[in-house]
Regions:
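Exposed loop/turn and edge beta-strand positions of beta-sandwich/beta-sheet ligand-binding modules
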Residues: 64, 92, 133
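Core segments of cupin and vicinal oxygen chelate
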Residues: 37-77
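Bacterial Sec-dependent N-terminal signal peptides
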Residues: 1-27
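Mid-chain, structured segments of secreted extracytoplasmic proteins
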Residues: 67-111
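N-terminal beta-strand motif that seeds the catalytic metal site of vicinal oxygen chelate
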Residues: 23-43, 94-96
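Vicinal oxygen chelate
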Residues: 41-43, 96-143, 154
Length: 154
């Protein structure tokens, strides 16, 4: 009888542990790990993201001269991968967005690097003001990928 109770307890424990693991997996939400951009000229793109967006370069495991990784959040990175055969056009609606304290101050930096910018409609260099009061501008990196910079309070 003691053996039956002992094995029953083990069986019930295993079932409960398995079920709790499944529940934990269902409750786990994915977190953004990285965004990868395929670039034509890694050196030029690296300078852009390092100098214009002032992103911090982080070590990458390949060390093959074809990758640059940047820290873009506590747990997220931007990966640049060299190998694109050409620069291709991209739609502005597909973009990466970074928030800054002041869009006006960021525009000064864009002007310093002679980087063209537009609003969401594409008809002005002035920032778009969203219905929630956030200012935003758009510009392109050396490979034509669109970037939004706004002053959203996170």
């Amino acid at each position: 009888m003691k053996k039956i109770l002992y094995y029953s307890a083990i069986l019930i424990s295993c079932v409960l542990l398995t079920q709790s693991g499944v529940v934990a997996q269902v409750k786990h939400k994915p977190v953004l790990n990285h965004i990868a951009l395929y670039v034509f000229n890694l050196e030029k793109s690296t300078r852009f993201y390092r100098d214009v967006l002032e992103l911090e370069i982080t070590p990458e495991p390949f060390n093959d001269g074809k990758h640059t990784w940047f820290k873009i959040g506590d747990y997220s990175q931007l990966h640049l991968i060299e190998g694109a055969k050409q620069i291709t056009p991209h739609e502005k609606s597909s973009h990466i967005c970074f928030s800054v304290k002041s869009v006006k101050e960021f525009i000064v930096l864009l002007d310093k690097y002679k980087i063209d910018r537009i609003n969401m409609k594409g008809d002005s260099k002035s920032p778009t003001i969203r219905p929630d009061g956030v200012s935003q501008i758009y510009f392109q990196d050396p490979d034509g990928y669109w970037i939004e910079v706004n002053d959203a309070k996170l």
